[in-house]
Amino acid sequence: MSFTLAIVGRPNVGKSTLFNRLVGRKLALVDDQPGVTRDLREGAARLADLRFTVIDTAGLEDANDDSLEGRMRRLTERAVSMADATLFVMDARAGVTTNDLVFADILRKSGRPVVLAANKAEGNAGQSGLLDAYSLGLGEPLALSAEHGEGMADLVQVLRPMIEAAASAEEAETDVDVEGEDRVITHSKPLQIAVVGRPNAGKSTLINQIIGEDRLLTGPEAGITRDAIGLTFEWDDVPMRIFDTAGMRKRAKVQEKLEKLSVSDGLRAVKFAEVVVVLLDAAIPFESQDLRIADLAEREGRAVVIAVNKWDVEPEKQQKLKDLRVGLERLLPQLRGAPLVTVSAKTGKGLDKLHAAIMKIHATWNTRISTARLNQWLAAMIEAHPPPAPGGRRIKLRYMTQAKTRPPGFVVMCSHPQNLPEAYSRYLVNGLRQDFDMPGTPIRLWMRSQADDNPYKNRKKSTPSRLNKHVRKGETKKG
């Protein structure tokens, strides 16, 4: 998952101008009217060779909670808690204001890394304000001009170590050699989960229910969540990092630039997650976009849990559950046996089952099987259903071993692997799922010829000529 930087500050200090410079396009509406950016806006930032996610927040305004400014302040505080670091922007020409002092105190108490930037510092007009910024107690301020691009090199030097540290800490351990160490969930390496689905399926509401806090903006409007931001917490004493992704719409409907970026970030969340929770709407499950999302998670080799939301308002629960199981089996055969859990994000019912399903599928995703057990199993499978004999030449399956975990991957050494039908490979994969209790887990199976490792495979056979035979015989006699 990419490093996330939240840009915060009073209205009209240049946050949106800086955001636009970082993303290289005008995504945030820029105006001289304070408070013109009223929501979180996210983009894929490029700064020199650095790549990260940047959030443009609403202005930090000292106002009562019932006003629009109060809502903006609460939302900004959430963005700060969700981001990896905060870029606090003040106006060097205006100097430090009362609101700057109040919110500098909020940022210090957050415990998150804060970079102080004095914007509009070009020329002599900003020098006094630049010196004044030291009084905020957030360290040495960076002198920037978002409008003219000044100070960007200094910003690169400050952000680089933060981004590199976050990248090494967050990346999910996948495609691990079977000889590697067992996966141990710790606070430094929490279980990484992505919650994905169509817009308005209830992803943010579900996460708020899980973590017990109203940390994500929710509402009836589809697409209200525009970013994929990770929240670290403990769920039943298990350290987890959960990503709430923007709703993945059909491509034809993804027209806004922001939504395109959000969907892209959602896809990255899937790639960096260990377990992907595909959230369906009970009223309209298994639309084509749902199937694409689940298929993407399987192709990326992630453990998958299917969660059906809004179960509290489903009138025909028993029949609907039966239809869901049939639909899952028919439409997603590659995820045969994946956990299917019914939940209500609104009431919290079913969360205990969801937690159990996540833990079980994660353990299965890390399954290791000894070579001895695998070869005993392979012999039984061959006896029950021998491989075909295309052209009268029977394919021999000689040996099997596990090559990796996360997801489980196996290699079968055989003769003529190119002639083995796909149906027989599916027979083996389905057998692995059933006999080793790996339902719903992506399984990788590779057929290899023993000749693949033969260094002399493509060499021409050398036939000695009569002259060479004569010379060799002569050399032998001389010896």
From Swiss-Prot:
Task: Tell me which residues bind GTP 1.
Answer: 9-16, 56-60, 119-122
Which of this chain's residues are annotated to bind GTP 2?
Answer: 197-204, 244-248, 309-312
Ordered alphabetically, the record's keywords are:
GTP-binding, Nucleotide-binding, Repeat, Ribosome biogenesis
Gene3D superfamilies reported in the protein's UniProt record: 3.30.300.20, P-loop containing nucleotide triphosphate hydrolases
Q: Superkingdom of the source?
A: Bacteria
Transmembrane region(s):
none
GO BP terms: namely:
ribosome biogenesis
- Composition bias type Basic residues, residue spans: 457-472
Single GO term (MF): GTP binding
**KH-like domain mapped to chain residues:** 367-453
Q: Which residues form the EngA-type G domain?
A: 3-167, 191-366
Instruction: For the region Disordered, give the residue spans.
Output: 449-479
Describe the family membership recorded for this protein in Swiss-Prot or TrEMBL.
Belongs to the TRAFAC class TrmE-Era-EngA-EngB-Septin-like GTPase superfamily. EngA (Der) GTPase family.
Q: How does it assemble?
A: Associates with the 50S ribosomal subunit.
HAMAP family in alphabetical order: GTPase_Der (MF_00195)
Chain's role: GTPase that plays an essential role in the late steps of ribosome biogenesis.
Protein name as annotated: GTPase Der
Q: Which organism is it from?
A: Jannaschia sp. (strain CCS1)
